[in-house]
């Protein structure tokens, strides 16, 4: 594993932040040089909350790259999708600033995990979806799903979008923290999605996030 990877989810609040932090921690334990980035954070000021969670999970203090703003290049105060948060803050989202920050991190670290906002179809601007940006940059995707009711549908829609856009799926992360309270639904979702991943993206990895990984 080397390079820049985009961490997305099948929905908002699906566990991307914890998954990103846990994956970064595992890579650190393997001796890898890794950093996480939250290119667009909404609902915050000055510091990206998700980056703080990443560092806590990784067992690391805020890094020099964090202090330089490279890991959180765009922060908006209103908790909404980036296109709306930018409009309400009265300024445009600077895609060049984000691209440059990611490139600088990639030059310093072996692996950069870029956590997106929401799912693949979340608008970054009025004219650009998150999935458009991922395709433009050529990033492989790490997709976070769960065992809660509706996850099969949302995951298959995400699979279809990735195929349509010609984007490589690196791995599917099944988040047990957000499992359905119904054990039958949770287990069936896991079994079904594991089979579909093998059928639809045979080279992609299957990963699981345990309940004990909850922050």
UniProtKB/Swiss-Prot annotation:
**In the record, what terms sit under GO molecular function?**
ATP binding; dethiobiotin synthase activity; magnesium ion binding
Q: Listed GO cellular component terms? A: cytosol
Which EC class does it fall in? Answer: ligase
Domain of life, per lineage = Bacteria
Active site, renumbered: 38
NCBIfam families (alphabetical): bioD
Q: Describe the task this protein carries out.
A: Catalyzes a mechanistically unusual reaction, the ATP-dependent insertion of CO2 between the N7 and N8 nitrogen atoms of 7,8-diaminopelargonic acid (DAPA, also called 7,8-diammoniononanoate) to form a ureido ring.
Family to which the UniProt record says this protein belongs? Belongs to the dethiobiotin synthetase family.
Protein name from the UniProt record: ATP-dependent dethiobiotin synthetase BioD
Q: What is the lineage of its organism?
A: Bacteria, Pseudomonadati, Pseudomonadota, Betaproteobacteria, Neisseriales
């Amino acid at each position: 594993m080397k390079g820049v990877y985009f961490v997305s989810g099948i929905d908002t609040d699906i566990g991307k932040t914890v998954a990103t932090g846990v994956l970064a921690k595992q890579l650190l334990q393997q001796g890898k040089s890794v950093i996480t980035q939250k290119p667009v954070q909404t609902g915050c000021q000055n510091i990206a909350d998700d980056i703080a969670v990443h560092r806590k999970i990784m067992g690391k203090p805020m890094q020099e790259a964090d202090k330089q703003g490279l890991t959180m290049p765009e922060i908006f105060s209103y908790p909404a999708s980036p296109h709306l948060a930018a409009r309400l803050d009265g300024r445009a989202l600077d895609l060049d600033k984000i691209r440059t920050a990611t490139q600088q991190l990639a030059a310093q670290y072996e692996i950069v995990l870029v956590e997106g906002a929401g799912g693949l179809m979340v608008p970054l601007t009025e004219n650009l979806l998150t999935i458009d940006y991922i395709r433009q940059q050529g990033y492989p995707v790490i997709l976070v799903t769960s065992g809660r009711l509706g996850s099969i549908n949302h995951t298959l829609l995400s699979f279809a979008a990735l195929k349509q856009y010609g984007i490589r799926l690196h791995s599917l992360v099944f988040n047990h923290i957000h499992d359905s309270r119904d054990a039958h639904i949770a287990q069936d979702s896991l079994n079904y999605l594991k089979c579909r991943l093998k059928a639809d993206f045979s080279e992609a990895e299957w990963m699981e996030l345990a309940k004990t990984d909850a922050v």
